[in-house]
Amino acid sequence: MSPAMSLEHRLRRRFLALLASALLLPNWAQAQDADATPAQEPTADAEALEIVMRADEIRFPRDSFQTEIAVRNLSAGEQNDERKFRVLSRGNENTIVLSTEPASERGQALLMRGRDLWIFMPSVSQPVRLSLAQRLTGQVANGDLARANLAGDYIPTIIGREELDGQAAVVLSLSAVDRGVTYSKVKYWVAEKDSRPLKAEFYALSGRLLKTARYEEFKDMAGRLRPTRLVLEDALRAGEVSVLTYETMRLRDLPERMFTREYLRRLEQ
């Protein structure tokens, strides 16, 4: 079996496992506690999973792509830092994040395979293992750039519907599938009409709100309307904000051999 077919097979199995979990979880919970509030109908969780998958495909293409991202970090409304990154992504499992500005950090790269993440630095002989939750810059965690697969990393349930900025929105609670993902829990607002992502709140394992995100300025990129501006606001320190601008995005054929430590070592030379 070719590497591409193998990856496709793994992704298909993962989706089926998630769908099965979404269908079976309410009945399992009810069986554990006969006195508990009756579980949601199975279709509710299946619907939630479908909504998150559609929102994922709006944020980023399902196929291989390249995007250029500018990150401005602000404190009390004043910009104190700006960085730029090039992100190369193949499906939901393989990503390279290259630092392009400032010049002093050029040559640094993050490599994600599945949920395994390494950083490569010209001054260090061996790659260093990182967590998706570690801070990359400002309010941006490594996983915010390297991992965009909410449908694969979280178990979603619908917890309500409300109006947000004049739009009818579905409100979802996303629970991490394990501790290896970027956030323990996410509260997610998705437009009911077209599944556009609107807002997210990201929580720590303790339940503490870490930061909020707003998806803004939808424009035609890589074949469909996508949010080109993401505003991340620190919930613990008022006025600390990071603004991500997706300057370009295009579909690009990216062979799997690119997403290896050996390939990135060659880029450093």
Stretch-by-stretch model annotation:
Residues 29-36:
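Boundary at the C-terminal end of the N-terminal hydrophobic targeting segment
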Residues 43, 48-123:
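N-terminal mature ectodomain segment of secretory-pathway/periplasmic proteins
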Residues 49-50, 79, 147-158, 207-212:
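A short, amphipathic edge element
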Residues 126-129, 142-145, 149, 167-262:
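Gly/Pro-enriched, hydrophobic low-complexity segments
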